[in-house]
Structure formats: C-alpha cells, structure tokens
Amino acid sequence: MAEFVRAEILGTKFEYTTRYVNPQPIGMGSFGLVCSAFDQITQQPVALKKIMKPFDSSSLAKRTYREIRLLKYLRHENLICLRDIFISPLEDIYIATELLGTDLGRLLSIKPLDSKFSQYFIYQILRGLKYIHSANVIHRDLKPTNILINENCDLKICDFGLARLQEPQMTGYVATRYYRAPEIMLTWQRYGVQVDVWSAGCILAEMLRGKPLFPGKDHVHQFHLITNVLGNPPDAVIEKITSKNTVNFVKSLPSREPRDLSTVIMTHTSIAIDLLKKMLVIDPDTRISAQDALRHPYLAPYHDPTDEPAASGPFDWSFDSADFPKETWKIMIYSEVLDYLNVGNPADPAPFDPSTPFDPSALEREFSEFLSDSGQI
C-alpha cells in the first residue's frame, strides 16, 4: 500500500505518495490545485493536479470520471500525457501528467511571438486537434492557457475537463469568451468539432498580432466584435438559430461588411492571413477542418501526412448520457484508477519521425533564447 505525505499548500491540504517530492504550487482553479513535483521513479518532473471535492455532487464526479477516461484514451504527442492517478486518504483524486515549462497565455502576456514560432505552434495545435476530432471528441475549452510549451518548442494541449462527444445537442457552457465560436453564442445547443478550429484561429490571430482579436466584455459585446471584423452572419447561419430572441438580436445588428483581415492583423504574410480567413468563418459548415488546415501552404514547412496520426477509433461516450448518483460515479472512478494501476502506463506517443523534412533544432535554439530573454527559464 502506498505511503502518503500530507502538506498544506495555498491553504489546501495536499496529499501525495512518497513517489513524489518537492511539490510547488503552479496553478489554482475552481476545479483543483496544480503543483509541480519530482517523480522519483521516472526521474522526471510532473504536474500533480488535485481535483477538489470530486464526490461532492454527481456532476463533479461525472466530470472527474470523464477527464480520467479521456486522459487514459487520448495518446498523442501534442496532448498532455497521463503519468499516474491515485486516490488520497481524504478521498481526493490526484492526476499526474508531464510537466512543461510554461503556457502560451503566459508567453503572450510578456512579449510578442516571432512569426516562425506562431507558425510552428499553430501547426502543433492543429495536429493535436486532428487527432482529438478523429476520436469523436470536442475539446470545447481551447485557449492560450490550455496550450503548454517547453523550451524545445514542444506544444501540448491540456485540460479535457469540458470535452464532449460530437453530437447534435450540446450544453452551452464552454470556452473562455475570447475564443468562443459564434455558433455557440447563436444557438447554445448545436455545434461540432468546428468550435475548436475557431478557437485555434483566435489563438493564431493573437499570436500574430500580439493581443486578442475578439476581447469581448460580455456575450453581446463579443458578438459585436466578431461581426465588426467578419461582417454579418449569412442567412445560412441565421436559419440554424433555434432561439427567436437570438434571431431578432442578429437581425437587429447594423449592416457590416467583412474587413480585410490583413488590416486587422497587420504586417504578416498573405499566406498566414489566408489560413486565418479559412479558420475564422462564421458559418461552421464552411469553416476549414483541422485536417484540411494542416494541408494549407502556410504550414508546408511542417506538414507531413505520414506523421499526423488519427485516433485508433472513436472514444466510447456511452457513459455520458447517464445520470448516476455520485456514489455510482465514485465506484466507476475507483474502477478506472485501479484499471490504470493494474494495466500500467502505456508507452508515450512516439516523437516526431526523424525522416520528416523539418529539422527543429535551429528553431528550438531560438525559442530557448526567447524564453530566457522572457524570464521563463
């Protein structure tokens, strides 16, 4: 039986096995506390996330179960990798994942990115999204702070707590406002994997211009900012809106023509703007997919169709429609943890194929210098 150490970190009881040493707080949110720590078995640093009160309600327990199942299933080098799961004596859930040095949000808050970093980062984001979407999963909360990066330019998407099955009817609580797709604001219940592509487009625009493209103060202001740049929603979009009040709101907007994105982003190549135009399309049915975006000429230096894997099959979402009491979810979570511990940690995703035409070494050196200058390492 594992031995536990108890500490108090940021006023929170933090229990961890003796496998880990030197926990240091790196993040705190409504769903948990995250600490860096050193794994004495793998001799690698990890991020230890304590999920706060996972069994307080059936909805929290279900969210925890969903996140654990997704982390166990999704295995790709541009997604955060699960290292360990354990349940503490106080019955809190702890998830250990690989630790990367910083996140994109932090980098963007310090100084603008060089265009070559923006190009490589959006390639990796889309590469990860292709895999996620092929598993029939929507991330739903893609934003710079959920994009982790290390000094070698390796990028990994994290935080699958809000991820969902792609299906016709969806709940409306998703995504930080700046990166929220218009179809979510217009209908709230009908959307697909295209919402992640919109979020990725907003992230690309922010990397290129050095500040958010649509920094809305509220839901209505957010939509005004979008239409101010992209013009009014086409009739095909309005026809799909299910709320009469929303239809009336959209029709009440002043007439606006799309602006030239190059005048909004400024000083960047037309090829980057062309990809952005295809990602930031109000109608999700005509928005480019992650897979097609990888083939865009802007990403030609990195694109390798033999090294952009899809999932082995769709994720099993059969549990997601269940409305179990929290005690049942608790048993299911315990079962998943025991299964993980008994089966063991699957092999990490393979690194980039060295036969790819892209040699990242020079870019890695430049990015390491960028991080050093920014005080991130």
Curated annotation (Swiss-Prot):
<dbReference type="InterPro" id="IPR017441">
    <property type="entry name" value="Protein_kinase_ATP_BS"/>
</dbReference>
<feature type="binding site">
    <location>
        <begin position="26"/>
        <end position="34"/>
    </location>
    <ligand>
        <name>ATP</name>
    </ligand>
</feature>
<comment type="function">
    <text>Mitogen-activated protein kinase required for growth on media where sorbitol or mannitol is the sole carbon source.</text>
</comment>
<dbReference type="GO" id="GO:0005524">
    <property type="term" value="F:ATP binding"/>
</dbReference>
<feature type="modified residue" description="Phosphotyrosine">
    <location>
        <position position="173"/>
    </location>
</feature>
<dbReference type="InterPro" id="IPR003527">
    <property type="entry name" value="MAP_kinase_CS"/>
</dbReference>
<feature type="domain" description="Protein kinase">
    <location>
        <begin position="20"/>
        <end position="299"/>
    </location>
</feature>
<keyword id="KW-0067">ATP-binding</keyword>
<dbReference type="GO" id="GO:0004707">
    <property type="term" value="F:MAP kinase activity"/>
</dbReference>
<dbReference type="InterPro" id="IPR008271">
    <property type="entry name" value="Ser/Thr_kinase_AS"/>
</dbReference>
<feature type="modified residue" description="Phosphothreonine">
    <location>
        <position position="171"/>
    </location>
</feature>
<keyword id="KW-0808">Transferase</keyword>
<keyword id="KW-0723">Serine/threonine-protein kinase</keyword>
<keyword id="KW-0418">Kinase</keyword>
<dbReference type="InterPro" id="IPR011009">
    <property type="entry name" value="Kinase-like_dom_sf"/>
</dbReference>
<dbReference type="InterPro" id="IPR000719">
    <property type="entry name" value="Prot_kinase_dom"/>
</dbReference>
<dbReference type="GO" id="GO:0106310">
    <property type="term" value="F:protein serine kinase activity"/>
</dbReference>
<protein>
    <recommendedName>
        <fullName>Mitogen-activated protein kinase mpkC</fullName>
        <ecNumber>2.7.11.24</ecNumber>
    </recommendedName>
</protein>
<feature type="short sequence motif" description="TXY">
    <location>
        <begin position="171"/>
        <end position="173"/>
    </location>
</feature>
<dbReference type="InterPro" id="IPR050117">
    <property type="entry name" value="MAP_kinase"/>
</dbReference>
<feature type="binding site">
    <location>
        <position position="49"/>
    </location>
    <ligand>
        <name>ATP</name>
    </ligand>
</feature>
<feature type="active site" description="Proton acceptor">
    <location>
        <position position="141"/>
    </location>
</feature>
<dbReference type="Pfam" id="PF00069">
    <property type="entry name" value="Pkinase"/>
</dbReference>
<keyword id="KW-0597">Phosphoprotein</keyword>
<comment type="similarity">
    <text>Belongs to the protein kinase superfamily. Ser/Thr protein kinase family. MAP kinase subfamily. HOG1 sub-subfamily.</text>
</comment>
<keyword id="KW-0547">Nucleotide-binding</keyword>
